[in-house]
C-alpha cells in the first residue's frame, strides 16, 4: 500500500523509508565532527596510502597537504600513461603552453593522428610531472602508477606493483572521477561506463586487491551531486551515491574508519573550475570554495 501511495503522490522527495508505519526521508543537517582522541595507526609516519586521481586537480592538492602533515608515502594512481616530454615544457607559462599545443597538434595531424587526443596526453603528462615535482619539493615521497580502474585484473596488478615497490597499503583515498554533463537522452553507454565504473567498481577492485589485515582507513572523494543531483549529471550523481554506499559497507563490514567527502565545487582546481562547468554553476549563484579552504578541510 505504501509503495502505491508513494507512486501516486506528487513530491520532490525521491528517497523515502517506512519504520513502524512512520514515513521517513533523508535530510541534511549541520553537525560538528568530534576530534579523534586516539591516534590512527594507518596515518602514522611512513605509512603507504594509495591515492587514485592523486596526481592532478583537487585530489592532488589534498594529497600534498595530507602527505606532508602526516609524513605518508604516497602511491598516486591515474588513468594517464605518461609520455616523453622535454624538461623545458614543465616550465612554460600559459602562452608557452598555447604555442606548444598548436605545434604538437599540427605535427600529430601530419602523422595521421587525432590532434586533440595527442595533445590531451601531453597536457596531462605535463600536469602530472609538475605535480610530482611539487610533491618532491615539499619532501613528500610520491610514486605514480597508471591504471584503468574499470578493469579488475589491471587494478589487481597495479595494487601488487604498489605493494612491491612502495609497501603494504595502509589507507586509500579514492578521488578518481570523470564527469561530462549533458541531457539524459544524449548520454551514451561509453560515457556512462567512463563515469560510473572507475568511481564505483574501481574502489571495489582496489579493496579486493589490498590486504584486508593491513588496510586501516578508506576515504572517498565524492560530490554534492551524489546527494542532491546536478544538471546533466544523472550518471555522475549515481556514481557518487554508489561510492558512498560502498564506503558505508566498508565501515560496517571491516570495522575501520571509512568516510566520503561529498565536495562542494572548488575554485581554481577540479571539474567545477572548467570554463563550461563554471559558467553553468555561476548561473545558479553558486559560490566556489577557495583552494586553501578545501585543503584545510
Predicted regions and their residues:
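A short, basic/flexible loop-to-alpha-helix module at the beginning of a structural domain
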Residues: 26-46
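4′-phosphopantetheine-dependent carrier domains
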Residues: 1-13, 19-23, 43-297
Amino acid at each position: 500500500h505504501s509503495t502505491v501511495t508513494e507512486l501516486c503522490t506528487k513530491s520532490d522527495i525521491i528517497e523515502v523509508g517506512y519504520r513502524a508505519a512512520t514515513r521517513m526521508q533523508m535530510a541534511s543537517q549541520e553537525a560538528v565532527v568530534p576530534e579523534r582522541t586516539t591516534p590512527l595507526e594507518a596515518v602514522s609516519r611512513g605509512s603507504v596510502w594509495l591515492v587514485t586521481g592523486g596526481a592532478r586537480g583537487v585530489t592532488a592538492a589534498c594529497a600534498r597537504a595530507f602527505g606532508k602533515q602526516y609524513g605518508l608515502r604516497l602511491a598516486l594512481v591515474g588513468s594517464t600513461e605518461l609520455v616523453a616530454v622535454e624538461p623545458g615544457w614543465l616550465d612554460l607559462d600559459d602562452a608557452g603552453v598555447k604555442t606548444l599545443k598548436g605545434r604538437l597538434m599540427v605535427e600529430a595531424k601530419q602523422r595521421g593522428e587525432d590532434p586533440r587526443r595527442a595533445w590531451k596526453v601531453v597536457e596531462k603528462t605535463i600536469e602530472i610531472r609538475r605535480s610530482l615535482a611539487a610533491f618532491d619539493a615539499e619532501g613528500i615521497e610520491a610514486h605514480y602508477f597508471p591504471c584503468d580502474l574499470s578493469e579488475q585484473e589491471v587494478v589487481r596488478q597495479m595494487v601488487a606493483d604498489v605493494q612491491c615497490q612502495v609497501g603494504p597499503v595502509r589507507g586509500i583515498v579514492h578521488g578518481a572521477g570523470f564527469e561530462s554533463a549533458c541531457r539524459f537522452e544524449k548520454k551514451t553507454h561509453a560515457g556512462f561506463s567512463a563515469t560510473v565504473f572507475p568511481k564505483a567498481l574501481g574502489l571495489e577492485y582496489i579493496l579486493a586487491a589490498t590486504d584486508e589485515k593491513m588496510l586501516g582507513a578508506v576515504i572517498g572523494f565524492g560530490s554534492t551531486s551524489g546527494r542532491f543531483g546536478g544538471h546533466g549529471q544523472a550518471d555522475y550523481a549515481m556514481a557518487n551515491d554508489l561510492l558512498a554506499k560502498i564506503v558505508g559497507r566498508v565501515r560496517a563490514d571491516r570495522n575501520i574508519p571509512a568516510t566520503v567527502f561529498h565536495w562542494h565545487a572548488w575554485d581554481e582546481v577540479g571539474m567545477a573550475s572548467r570554463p563550461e562547468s563554471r559558467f553553468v554553476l555561476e548561473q545558479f549563484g553558486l559560490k566556489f570554495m577557495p583552494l586553501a579552504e578545501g585543503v584545510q578541510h
